[in-house]
Amino acid sequence: MKLSFTTKGWDSVSFDEFCRIACDTGFQGIELHGIDNPMFTSRGGPFSEYSAAATVRKMHETGLSIPCIDAVCDISAEDADAAAAHITECIKKASELRIPYVRVHAAESEDAAAAAAKSRAL
């Protein structure tokens, strides 16, 4: 079994440090929370259009992977259009980086809102 940890809540840690922590502690993966965070996507960031391929290659060489991107939205919220747009962007980025999963979350049990966001995103 492979284990990964999330970057959620670790706003002051660099991606290189995440990789070092994963290797040092025996984790095999890093789950990206907030892929649109400037820490990840700004020029020179590990997942900018210029750096993403090299970052994924470096991770593969060190035995690390990114099992999923965490969508930072609530699919049970009333604004299904905004949630769907964010999920669609996460799916696009996951596809570009060959990340197999996008994780979504629902803070409430609003089945209709969650279903609407899912159908709009897909």
Segments and roles (model prediction):
Residues 6-7, 43-44, 78-79, 111:
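A generic structural signal for short
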Residues 31-60, 107-110:
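Glycine-rich, proline-tolerant flexible connector loops at the mouths of alpha/beta enzymes
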Residues 35-42, 68-76:
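Glycine-/proline-rich flexible loop or hinge segments
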Residues 10:
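Hydrophobic pocket-lining residues within nucleotide cofactor-binding pockets
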Residues 16-36, 93-98:
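Catalytic domains of carbohydrate-active enzymes, especially glycoside hydrolases
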Residues 16-17, 53-65, 73-122:
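Active-site acidic/histidine proton-transfer and metal-coordination neighborhood
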Residues 3-7, 30-32, 66-71, 102-104:
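Hydrophobic faces of well-ordered beta-strands that scaffold small-molecule active sites
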